[in-house]
C-alpha cells in the first residue's frame, strides 16, 4: 500500500446502529468507504445509507458544503451573505448571547438538536453552563416518550434493548426494518430461519416486513392504543398472563383489569378495522410465546399522535403482564451509562433555573421534575 494511503476504522453516522466501516484515505482525501468485516456488529454489511458515491460527492466533498462561517449581508431574506473568520463568528455570537443573558436571563435562550449520536453531551454541557434549562430536539416525535414513560411504568427503558436473536416471537409494531434498518432485519430473519421464530407485524401498509410476517394486522392509523388495550383484555380474560410475574412485580392489576374490560374485542375491531379473530389471535400469539420481544416502533402510536402516550403505556403493560421484561427473548433493562458528571454539567444548573423550563408544570415527566 502506498505511503500516502491509509485505512481507518470508523462508525457510520447515519443511524443509531453505528455499523463499523473502513475508510480509505489517499493524500488526506477519502477515496473509499465500506463495511468492516471484522466488526462483530455488522460483519462488513452496510445499508444504502452509506452509498459511497452519494456520501462522498453529496456530503463530504459537496461543492456547496459550508466550510467557513457566513454572515448575513443586507436585509433578512435577501439571500446575501459574506464570509467571515471563525474568530469573528465566535466573538459576535458570544457577545450576542451574553447580551441576551444579561437583559432577559439565560432561560430566554432555547436550544435544539438533531438525533443524538456522540456530540449531545457537548450541547447539554453548554446549555447547563450558560444557565438555560430550555433545550430539546426531535425526540418528542421520536422515542423520547418511550424513554420516560417506560421508566414510569417499570423502572427502566428497555424497548430499545430487545433480544432479537433469542425471541420466539418478534413483534414489529410500526417498524419496517427491511427498509429502514436492514442490519436489524438480518438478525430477525436469521432468528426466523435458524430457530423458527415467528413474526407479527402491525402496520397500516403492507410493508416489506409485513409481507414476511406470520401475522399481519392492518391497523387503522392512530388506533394503536385501542389495539393494545384490546390485547391486554384478551390476555387477562383468557387467563394467559404470567401470574408469577404479576404477583411478584405488578401493582394495580385489578384496576388494569377493569380498564381493559372497557375494550372488548368487538369494540376494538370497530375502532381499529382489524377483525375480532385477528385481535384474539395476536393476543394469544404474544401471550403464549415462550418469549416475545416488542421493540419500540416509530410509525405506530409511539412517536406521534394524540394517543402516543397511551399506546406506549399499554405496550409497556403488555410486556409486563406476559413476563417479557428483563428476560432472554424479551426486553432487557440495562444499567444506566456511567458518564462522568463533567460531561453534561447538569449540576451546574441551579434548581432556580430548572424550575424555569418551559412546560415544567404541564409536562413534569419530560422536564427536570421528572
Predicted features along the sequence, with ranges:
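N-terminal export/assembly segments and adjacent metallocofactor-ligating motifs
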Residues: 1-238, 275, 360-366
Amino acid at each position: 500500500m502506498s505511503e500516502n494511503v491509509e485505512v481507518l476504522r470508523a462508525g457510520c453516522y447515519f443511524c443509531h446502529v453505528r455499523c463499523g466501516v473502513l475508510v480509505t484515505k489517499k493524500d488526506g482525501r477519502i477515496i473509499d468507504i465500506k463495511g468492516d468485516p471484522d466488526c462483530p456488529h455488522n460483519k462488513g454489511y452496510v445499508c444504502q445509507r452509506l452509498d459511497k458515491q452519494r456520501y462522498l460527492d453529496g456530503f463530504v466533498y459537496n461543492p456547496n458544503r459550508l466550510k467557513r462561517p457566513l454572515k448575513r449581508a443586507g436585509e433578512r431574506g435577501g439571500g446575501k451573505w459574506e464570509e467571515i473568520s471563525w474568530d469573528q463568528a465566535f466573538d459576535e455570537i458570544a457577545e450576542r448571547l451574553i447580551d441576551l443573558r444579561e437583559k432577559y436571563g439565560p432561560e430566554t435562550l432555547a436550544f435544539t438538536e438533531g438525533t443524538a449520536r456522540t456530540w449531545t453531551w457537548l450541547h447539554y454541557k453548554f446549555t447547563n453552563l450558560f444557565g438555560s434549562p430550555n433545550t430539546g430536539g426531535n425526540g418528542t416525535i421520536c422515542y423520547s416518550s418511550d424513554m420516560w414513560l417506560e421508566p414510569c411504568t417499570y423502572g427502566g427503558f428497555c424497548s430499545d434493548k430487545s433480544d432479537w436473536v433469542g425471541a420466539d416471537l418478534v413483534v414489529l409494531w410500526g417498524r419496517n426494518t427491511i427498509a429502514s434498518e436492514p442490519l436489524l432485519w438480518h438478525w430477525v430473519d436469521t432468528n426466523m430461519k435458524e430457530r423458527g421464530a415467528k413474526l407479527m407485524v402491525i402496520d397500516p401498509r403492507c410493508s416489506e416486513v409485513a409481507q414476511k410476517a406470520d401475522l399481519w394486522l392492518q391497523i387503522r392509523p392512530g388506533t394503536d392504543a385501542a389495539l393494545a388495550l384490546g390485547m391486554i383484555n384478551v390476555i387477562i380474560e383468557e387467563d394467559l398472563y404470567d401470574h408469577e410475574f404479576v404477583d411478584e412485580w405488578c401493582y394495580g392489576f385489578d384496576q388494569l383489569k377493569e380498564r381493559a374490560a372497557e375494550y372488548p374485542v368487538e369494540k376494538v375491531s370497530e375502532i381499529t378495522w382489524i377483525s375480532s379473530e385477528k385481535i384474539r389471535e395476536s393476543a394469544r400469539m404474544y401471550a403464549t410465546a415462550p418469549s416475545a420481544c416488542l421493540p419500540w416502533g416509530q410509525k405506530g402510536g409511539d412517536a406521534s399522535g394524540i394517543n402516543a402516550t397511551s399506546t406506549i403505556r399499554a405496550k409497556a403493560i403488555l410486556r409486563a403482564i406476559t413476563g417479557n421484561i428483563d428476560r432472554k427473548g424479551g426486553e432487557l433493562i440495562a444499567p444506566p451509562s456511567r458518564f462522568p458528571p463533567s460531561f453534561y454539567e447538569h449540576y451546574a444548573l441551579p434548581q432556580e433555573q430548572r424550575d424555569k423550563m418551559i412546560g415544567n408544570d404541564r409536562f413534569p415527566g419530560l422536564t427536570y421534575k421528572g
